[in-house]
């Protein structure tokens, strides 16, 4: 048994050093190329409208606010200033969303975003995004990369297509630090010893973002309340949870396997599903020794089996907001197909670790 485990870990490490590292290097190169174009567009936006200041800064070889959705798809979060005159309200009526309401006694004129406040006193995510979209469209025509970049049509999101190869979504957002949403108040679960109190304090201090992007309720149509609402995002908090042991290596393996074998019709799976399942695996295996290098095969296998279970149940709860289903809106046939593909992949890796050389 131990020999089989060691064999699997050996082949996974080989796969990591060859396939995962080359994937990372290729994506880093793409990010540099994409960020040059996005920075140029945002510079033009800032000239037209100084309230939208580019926050796409490079720190320690990574760009703040940039998320990799897939090797050809990225999201850049543009942090806005001056949320202060608004109260953050998440009453659970819109899973995964919250609203920003003008604080009592505060005048609209005190806000930097006065014309985007609704009659009821809410700061409208949709109105801000609509204005931003107009500015980006104008900036694309003026910027020095105008020959290689164009807006993606037929969406209220702000998306750029670069060199006909890459898609970048630019999402206006507010950074919320020092508060924690009520809809995530159950976390951490009291009966689970992971993460420890120090890590919990770090994660909560990291806070979350409020993104201006489309959020749909179960019927798939956006109500006016939803279009004014902001989407909760915990990217930095989630990254902090995955520090230590082989957690990040495990996620890197899953992302690479997804890119190579689970990029399927209907796009049922993305990197964020993988990240979410690694967090759940950490709860199931709370001891640091469970994440030693020699447990890499067991952890990867456990996550793939959990993924199959989620696909078969057609439900993948968000880690911090379990009422939010990350498979919502995905075609059932696409989820079934993904379950079959994941099962084939898991069986192949477990029964014949050497097959990783060809995967």
UniProtKB/Swiss-Prot annotation:
Name of the protein in question: Putative nucleotidyltransferase MAB21L1
Please tell me which top-level EC class this enzyme sits in: transferase
Q: Binding residues for a ribonucleoside 5'-triphosphate, per the UniProt record?
A: 23-24, 63-66, 248, 252-255
> Mind telling me which InterPro entries this protein's record contains?
Mab-21-like_nuc_Trfase, Mab-21_HhH/H2TH-like, MAB21L/cGLR
Subunit info here reads:
Monomer. Homodecamer; composed of 2 back to back homopentamers. The protein may exist as monomer in solution and oiligomerizes upon ligand binding.
Write out the function statement from the record: Putative nucleotidyltransferase required for several aspects of embryonic development including normal development of the eye. It is unclear whether it displays nucleotidyltransferase activity in vivo. Binds single-stranded RNA (ssRNA).
Any GO MF annotation of the entry? nucleotide binding
What family, per the record? Belongs to the mab-21 family.
Q: Where does it live in the cell?
A: Nucleus
**Subcellular location, principal:** nucleus
Q: Which keywords are on file for this protein?
A: Developmental protein, Magnesium, Metal-binding, Nucleotide-binding, Nucleotidyltransferase, Nucleus, Transferase
Any one Gene Ontology cellular component term annotated for this protein: nucleus
Q: Which Gene Ontology BP terms does the record give?
A: cornea development in camera-type eye
Q: Which SMART domains match?
A: Mab-21 (SM01265)
Show the Gene3D superfamilies listed in the entry.
Answer: 1.10.1410.40, 3.30.460.90
UniProt binding sites for Mg(2+): 73, 75
